[in-house]
């Protein structure tokens, strides 16, 4: 269980408007809250996809 998410590893959880799920292993958070988004990114919850380097993704590049 990730302290920032209310679900067990692999389950789904809600990460709607913030980037608090950076280390979350939930499958839904992986898609909706990218670990490569910079802190404070307002677009993190819009289904961005990480591209290579840890600081680049499709919505906050």
From Swiss-Prot:
Q: Which InterPro entries match?
A: Metalthion_dom_sf, Metalthion_dom_sf_vert, Metalthion_vert, Metalthion_vert_metal_BS
Pfam families with a match to the protein in the record = Metallothio
Q: Where is this region: Beta?
A: 1-29
Sites where the protein binds a divalent metal cation 4: 33-34, 44, 48
Q: Which Gene3D superfamilies match?
A: Metallothionein Isoform II
Q: Which residues bind a divalent metal cation 1?
A: 5, 7, 21, 24
At which positions is a divalent metal cation 7 bound? 50, 57, 59-60
**Region Alpha, annotated ranges:** 30-61
- Residues spanning the membrane: none
Coiled-coil region(s) at which residues?
Answer: none
Give the binding site residues for a divalent metal cation 6: 37, 41, 44, 60
Which parts of the sequence carry N-acetylmethionine? Answer: 1
Protein residues bound to a divalent metal cation 2: 7, 13, 15, 26
Q: Name the residues that bind a divalent metal cation 3.
A: 15, 19, 24, 29
According to its record, what is known about the domains? Class I metallothioneins contain 2 metal-binding domains: four divalent ions are chelated within cluster A of the alpha domain and are coordinated via cysteinyl thiolate bridges to 11 cysteine ligands. Cluster B, the corresponding region within the beta domain, can ligate three divalent ions to 9 cysteines.
Fill in the subunit field for this protein: Monomer.
Specify the protein name.
Answer: Metallothionein-2B
Instruction: Name its species.
Output: Oryctolagus cuniculus
